[in-house]
């Protein structure tokens, strides 16, 4: 059967479209034998060269790394398509010619297959209600795509997923009857303005289609405007509680308190809005960095664009590992398969054809759908739907109607539980406090005339706000988001917020070798040819070693020399010629076996070997950066080494800067039969290309003649891992007088195979990646048989020999891949941090062990036999085709092994699962399609940002922007730092908040005034604490951050040690210091400490209110005491409030009497002259004289008409007496102390060492605490603000006293819990060493 059949032939022949190996909606046709057509492509146009099916997959021997595909696409999708049916092509054609055959196939059946589809709308009651989400949910999933929403729904809620798919299919069918599946291609193309299939859309048409159809975006929840985020800050229960308190204050005409609460809440909402928006923007930028790209054909050129820029009408090039960018119609399929599990739930890959196999089955096989994954082959598609018009977009819209579940991180959920517990306890305590205060008749001495119930409830509300850490989860989310943004600076893009916290408990890193632990920049250094009767051979008589020199990365200039002749002197002389550009003079120094001018048989053999490697590595090209003059390899790095080596044998494209003469691009001489190619994958460990020979029975300089007169017209070149390829080798070459030839008469003996295996082992132990180069001559009959094979595996099996080995061994090539700079140090840091590093590679075991030793993963004390294993050893009977060993045996092996070689993707999964069973938190790297399951199985999937496929990136939690192992370790360190900082500010906030509840409760129980008023509590928690808390989130990493073992995954953020040595001691010390400040402040400013003596400092008169017949108390005389320290006087003074009969109003005299006189009277000696004179005439008519003090008081039996009336001889209700003044001063002391306790706690909580050792490491802390201290000072000295917050200016010594109490708290925090904690840790360390000692001795 034809392997590449045009669609019109399929139609007329009635063949099943799924049968051919490759299917194309042809632009042209070409010769039946797969050779080049007569048409010529213009330079730079798509179709410059044919390419093999799936050739973008990995090259043999490559550790799961995926090649770069940009330039590869340019050669892959040729407009000069081969046809196995016959006819010749005419190059590029207009749309009417290029797709006429496909149009004919569909035109007659279009009307039959496209009946008017019945659109089904949701019946009443079938719709889903939108679910309102919290701020944390919005923020933590702000970068979650609708694709992830669909995937999550498919796994977690299959019923909702099934219903969404059903409803979408009913309204927008995807079967073969869909108009996009059955419409003739030229009509479909015309609809979108596509005029030429080979050249794609013009830029003008792209702009028009983008304007018409919009960007290719799966819309998430629209970014909320700032004003909406601001309003949402007022919807939390705690803020609503504050708003109720503010409204109640205004209703009771407490204008200052009500206005102040509104101002504080508004400022807090503004700050929260700013931080949430900043974090959301940070996550949006991270998400945009992970957005996939795709290759499209526009104006005749293949170009990489962002998926968002794809428009209907675009021709998109598809290859293995791509994520399909939009819904599209297949117009070419080269063994193209996609995985549509995202849409269908079925895990089986779907073969894509040009015609739908079944017109009634959903998801027609000639359509590719957005967000599905290309798992095999290659193809082209014509885009017909983008954005929300794609099938995944429509399904996602249906799912969104079902609401979205919470996406809180485990850390956030834990904090919610912690906050809820603390909040519940705090509310219960506060309710008890309020009840006790009311029952005991609590009255605020600073506001003696205020409603006592309102006062205590308002204070309770303030303390409730402070004690309930409802803002912690949001602050943590913001820290995680901004931490993820900071990780980008270290080249790690965290895609999912939970990974930030998970990184902190990572205990095992499973890393690929190539490109991660090593640079991934292969350099060919050794070539070993295999030849009988060679005049130049090594000691074994069969092989000969050659060296490539100079080896300057991807610089192709150089030669191939006898390895044994490359001593230091020879290398020095060759370098002189190299620097002078005298490449033709290499032979004057040492015979250059890569120079075509040399005609000796050995040179012919060497160049023929490199010719095979060059032809097989067709997907990789060399270029020179004009700005840096650096040589670059575009494609697969393993092939890059071979292409560079081939250039030193003068095979390659002529590139500016490549100064060697005699360069020849042999690809034109050996046309590649694209559809017969077998791409590399990790299970085959080899790849095959098929080429037409320019001359019958000659491959380069190797003669293929045999005694039977067979005519060989083609050859299959097989390149791959030696241990796999050598199993299929039968022949080798023999050197003759005229050149090498295949020795058909004598097969390779087992002894000869063992000699080659010994060479392979020798090179591997030198940390070289070794590839074997072989070929098999093919007749026309062989090529026809290859075409009849059903797939790539069958073609490879045929070429290797169905009944016997058929390959001709040419030689092996060894390439060095140097370790990345810093990898050894990073592995050492992992060891110090208690993180185990495992290397998983597809290389041979000797190569893997050698590299592991180079990077320090295996030390001189390690036994390679015990510490490394070939992954076949993880399977029953050492057969990788069998099942894995039982879990117990696997766990035992994986617990000790550091290096896994010849690993398959399923081995990675087994390794991850075994490590997780052992309690480890595992990070796994990967880059290929087959790595995706292992990445998902790991706790932290790490994809490569450069070499990684879209599939791997989509399955990962983190993408390395530089593909560097060092970046993983840096990300772990950053994750530990972020988690440590979260611990610090959670401890800071919890400790201070709980401390407030403690000293409030003790104050009420001890019959003391409240240490803080309501607004002071709000200021303390919403404004003053905020700045240090933010500064704690910016703390640099602790020195011991990477010297401690990983924390357990389920460890709570506040561990037992944090409670015992952090939170609890501080809450006790803070409560003690604040209460000490309050008690001493009250005593120094009033002479008393408790409420009853404080209230007794004023004398009261009881009047009856006429309208309500109730008693009202009025003050008429007060005395209070203060200890003063001035330049003139130090000691107690007595302050007095009295009713002045001369002025007829209540007056206050501070320092009315030196000393402390509780029983002062008008006759007390030393009384202020002003008072003596005022009372000299006694009390006037209408007032009485107090018999105890001699001061005036209201007349007995006085009645008042309302509560606002003031009886003659008494103070008005709003009068601020000396007792209230002293109480306010004492409370101002405790307020200042509370601020300084919490501010200095921010310094002590940063480290378990002495705080002064890290005092200056975070300038943000100094700024934050300066702001808090400044704001506090302003609250006590600025008029207006003073009255709002019930503070007052204090004498200098009281400021020092209040601040000093804060420093007492600091000293206690430093001298008691920290040394105890360090002592505990030292004992634990000694115990650990003691327990290890017997094991070491044993």
Curated annotation (Swiss-Prot):
GO terms for biological process: intracellular potassium ion homeostasis; intracellular sodium ion homeostasis; potassium ion import across plasma membrane; proton transmembrane transport; sodium ion export across plasma membrane. GO terms for molecular function: ATP binding; ATP hydrolysis activity; P-type sodium:potassium-exchanging transporter activity. One of its GO terms (cellular component) is plasma membrane. Its EC number is 7.2.2.3. It comes from the Eukaryota. Changing residue 419 to S: Reduces sensitivity of the protein to inhibition by cipargamin and (+)-SJ733. PROSITE patterns: ATPASE_E1_E2. Inhibited by cipargamin, a synthetic spiroindolone. Inhibited by pyrazoleamide PA21A050, structurally unrelated to the spiroindolones. Inhibited by (+)-SJ733, a dihydroisoquinolone compound. Residues 91-104 have a biased composition (Polar residues). InterPro entries: ATPase_P-typ_cation-transptr_C (IPR006068), ATPase_P-typ_cation-transptr_N (IPR004014), ATPase_P-typ_cyto_dom_N (IPR023299), ATPase_P-typ_P_site (IPR018303), ATPase_P-typ_TM_dom_sf (IPR023298), ATPase_P-typ_transduc_dom_A_sf (IPR008250), Cation_transp_ATPase_P-type (IPR050510), HAD-like_sf (IPR036412). SUPFAM superfamilies: Calcium ATPase, transduction domain A, Calcium ATPase, transmembrane domain M, HAD-like, Metal cation-transporting ATPase, ATP-binding domain N. Keywords: ATP-binding, Cell membrane, Hydrolase, Ion transport, Membrane, Nucleotide-binding, Sodium, Sodium transport, Translocase, Transmembrane, Transmembrane helix, Transport. Residues 1-106 are annotated as: Disordered. Its main location: membrane. It catalyses: Na(+)(in) + ATP + H2O = Na(+)(out) + ADP + phosphate + H(+). Sodium-exporting ATPase. Required for the extrusion of Na(+) from the parasites to maintain a low cytosolic concentration of Na(+). Required for maintaining the viability of extracellular parasites but not for intracellular growth, egress or invasion. Involved in parasite virulence. This is P-type sodium-transporting ATPase4.
């Amino acid at each position: 059967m034809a392997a590449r059949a045009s669609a019109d032939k399929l139609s007329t022949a009635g063949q099943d479209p799924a049968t051919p190996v490759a299917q194309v909606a042809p632009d042209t046709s070409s010769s039946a034998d797969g050779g080049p057509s007569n048409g010529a492509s213009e330079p730079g146009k798509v179709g410059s060269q044919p390419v093999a099916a799936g050739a973008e997959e990995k090259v043999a021997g490559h550790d799961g790394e995926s090649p770069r595909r940009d330039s590869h696409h340019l050669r892959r999708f040729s407009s000069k398509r081969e046809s196995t049916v016959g006819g010749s092509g005419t190059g590029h054609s207009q749309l009417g010619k290029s797709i006429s055959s496909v149009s004919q196939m569909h035109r007659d059946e279009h009307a039959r297959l496209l009946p008017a589809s019945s659109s089904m709308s949701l019946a009443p009651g079938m719709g889903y209600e939108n679910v309102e989400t919290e701020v944390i949910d919005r923020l933590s999933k702000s970068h979650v795509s609708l694709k992830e929403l669909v995937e999550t729904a498919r796994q977690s809620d299959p019923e909702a997923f099934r219903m969404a798919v059903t409803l979408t299919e009913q309204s927008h069918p995807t079967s073969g009857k869909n108009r996009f599946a059955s419409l003739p291609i030229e009509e479909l193309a015309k609809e979108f303005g596509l005029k030429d299939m080979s050249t794609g859309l013009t830029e003008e048409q792209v702009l028009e289609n983008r304007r018409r159809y919009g960007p290719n975006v799966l819309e998430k929840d629209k970014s909320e405007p700032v004003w909406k985020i601001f309003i949402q800050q007022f919807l939390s229960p705690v803020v609503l509680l504050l708003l109720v308190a503010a409204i109640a204050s205004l209703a009771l005409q407490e204008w200052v308190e009500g206005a102040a609460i509104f101002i504080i809440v508004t400022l807090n909402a503004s700050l929260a809005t700013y931080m949430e928006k900043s974090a959301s923007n940070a996550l949006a930028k991270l998400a945009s960095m992970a957005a996939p790209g795709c290759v499209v054909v526009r104006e005749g050129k293949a170009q990489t664009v962002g998926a968002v820029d794809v428009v209907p009408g675009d021709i998109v090039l598809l290859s293995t590992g791509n994520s399909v960018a939009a819904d599209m119609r297949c117009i070419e399929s080269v063994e193209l398969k996609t995985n549509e599990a995202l849409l269908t739930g079925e895990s089986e890959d779907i073969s894509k054809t040009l015609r739908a196999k079944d017109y009634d089955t959903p998801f027609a096989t000639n359509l590719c759908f957005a967000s599905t994954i290309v798992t095999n082959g290659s193809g082209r598609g014509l885009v017909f739907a983008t954005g929300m018009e794609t099938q995944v977009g429509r399904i996602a819209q249906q799912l969104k109607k079902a609401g979205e579940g919470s996406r809180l991180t485990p850390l956030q959920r834990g904090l919610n539980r912690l906050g809820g517990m603390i909040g519940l306890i705090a509310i219960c305590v506060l309710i008890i406090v309020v009840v006790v205060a009311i029952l005991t008749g609590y009255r605020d001495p600073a506001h003696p005339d205020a409603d006592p119930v309102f006062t205590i409830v308002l204070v309770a509300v303030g303390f409730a706000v402070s004690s309930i850490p409802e803002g912690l989860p949001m602050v943590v989310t913001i820290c995680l988001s901004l931490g993820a943004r900071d990780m980008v600076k270290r080249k790690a893009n965290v895609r999912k917020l939970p990974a930030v916290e998970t990184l902190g408990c990572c205990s095992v890193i499973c890393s690929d070798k190539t490109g991660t632990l090593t640079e991934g920049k292969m350099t060919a250094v050794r070539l070993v040819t295999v030849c009988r009767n060679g005049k130049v051979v090594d000691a074994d008589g069969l092989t000969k070693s050659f060296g490539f020199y100079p080896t300057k990365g991807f610089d192709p200039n150089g030669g191939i020399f006898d390895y044994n002749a490359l001593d230091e002197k020879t290398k020095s002389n060759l370098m002189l010629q190299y620097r002078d550009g005298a490449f033709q003079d290499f032979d004057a120094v040492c015979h250059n076996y890569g120079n075509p001018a040399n005609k000796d048989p050995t040179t012919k053999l060497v160049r023929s070997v490199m010719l095979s490697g060059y032809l097989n590595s067709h997907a990789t090209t060399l270029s020179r950066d004009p700005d840096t003059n650096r040589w670059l390899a575009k494609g697969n790095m393993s092939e890059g080494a071979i292409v560079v080596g081939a250039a030193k044998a003068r095979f390659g494209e002529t590139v500016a800067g490549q100064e060697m003469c005699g360069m020849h691009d042999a690809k034109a001489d050996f046309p590649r039969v694209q559809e017969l190619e077998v791409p590399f994958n990790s299970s085959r460990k080899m790849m095959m290309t098929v080429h037409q020979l320019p001359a019958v029975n000659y491959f380069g300089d190797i003669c293929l003649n045999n005694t039977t007169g067979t005519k060989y017209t083609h050859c299959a070149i097989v390149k791959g891992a030696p241990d796999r390829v050598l199993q299929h080798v039968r022949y080798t070459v023999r050197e003759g007088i005229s050149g090498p030839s295949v020795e058909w008469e004598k097969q390779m003996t087992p002894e000869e195979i063992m000699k080659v295996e010994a060479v392979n082992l020798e090179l591997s132990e030198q940390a070289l990646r070794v590839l074997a180069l072989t070929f098999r001559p093919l007749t026309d009959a062989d090529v026809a048989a290859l075409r009849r094979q059903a797939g790539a595996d069958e073609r490879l099996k045929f070429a290797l020999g169905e009944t016997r080995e058929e390959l001709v061994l040419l030689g092996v090539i060894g390439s060095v891949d140097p370790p990345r700079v810093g990898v050894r140090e990073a592995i050492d840091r992992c060891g110090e941090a208690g993180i185990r590093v495992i290397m998983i590679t597809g290389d041979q075991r000797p190569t893997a062990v050698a590299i592991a030793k180079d990077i320090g993963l295996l030390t001189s004390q390690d036994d390679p036999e015990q510490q490394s294993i070939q992954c076949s050893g993880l399977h029953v009977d050492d057969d990788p085709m069998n099942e894995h060993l039982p879990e117990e045996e696997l766990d035992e092996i994986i617990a000790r092994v550091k290096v896994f070689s010849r690993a398959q993707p399923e081995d990675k999964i087994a390794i991850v699962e075994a490590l997780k069973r052992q309690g480890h938190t595992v990070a796994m790297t990967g880059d290929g399609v087959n790595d995706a399951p292992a990445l998902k199985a790991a706790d932290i999937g790490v994809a490569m940002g450069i070499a990684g496929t879209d599939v791997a990136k989509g399955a990962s939690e983190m993408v390395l922007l530089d593909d560097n192992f060092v970046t993983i370790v840096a990300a772990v360190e950053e994750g530990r730092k972020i988690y440590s900082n979260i611990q610090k500010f959670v401890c800071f906030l919890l400790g201070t908040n709980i401390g407030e509840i403690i000293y409030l409760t003790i104050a009420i129980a001890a019959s003391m005034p409240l240490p803080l008023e309501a607004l002071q509590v709000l200021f303390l928690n919403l404004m003053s604490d905020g700045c240090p808390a933010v500064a704690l989130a910016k703390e640099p990493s602790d020195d011991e951050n990477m010297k401690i073992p990983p924390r357990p995954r389920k460890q709570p953020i506040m561990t037992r040690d944090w409670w015992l040595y952090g939170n609890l001691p501080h809450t006790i010390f803070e409560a003690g210091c604040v209460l000490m400040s309050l008690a001493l402040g009250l005593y120094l400013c009033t002479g008393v400490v408790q409420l009853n003596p404080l209230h007794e400092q004023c004398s009261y008169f009881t009047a009856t209110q006429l309208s309500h017949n109730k008693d009202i108390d009025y003050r008429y005389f007060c005395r209070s005491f203060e200890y003063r320290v001035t330049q003139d006087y130090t000691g107690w003074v007595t302050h007095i409030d009295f009713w002045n009969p001369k002025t007829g109003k209540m007056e206050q005299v501070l320092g009315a009497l030196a000393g402390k006189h509780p029983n002062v009277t008008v006759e007390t000696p030393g009384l202020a002259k002003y008072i003596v004179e005022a009372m000299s005439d006694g009390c006037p008519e209408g007032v009485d004289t107090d018999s105890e003090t001699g001061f005036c008081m209201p007349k007995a039996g006085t009645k008042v008409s309302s509560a606002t009336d003031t009886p003659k001889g008494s103070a008005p209700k709003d009068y601020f007496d000396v007792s209230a003044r002293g109480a306010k001063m004492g409370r101002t002391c405790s307020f200042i102390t509370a601020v300084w306790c919490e501010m200095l706690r921010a310094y002590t909580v940063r480290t378990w060492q002495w705080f002064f050792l890290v005092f200056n490491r975070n300038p943000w802390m100094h700024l934050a605490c300066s702001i808090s201290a400044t704001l506090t000072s302003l609250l006590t000295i600025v008029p207006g603000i003073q009255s709002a917050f019930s503070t007052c200016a204090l004498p200098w010594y009281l400021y020092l006293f209040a601040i000093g109490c804060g420093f007492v708290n600091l000293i206690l925090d430093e001298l008691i819990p920290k040394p105890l904690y360090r002592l505990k840790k030292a004992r634990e360390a000694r115990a650990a060493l003691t327990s290890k000692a017997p094991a070491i001795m044993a």
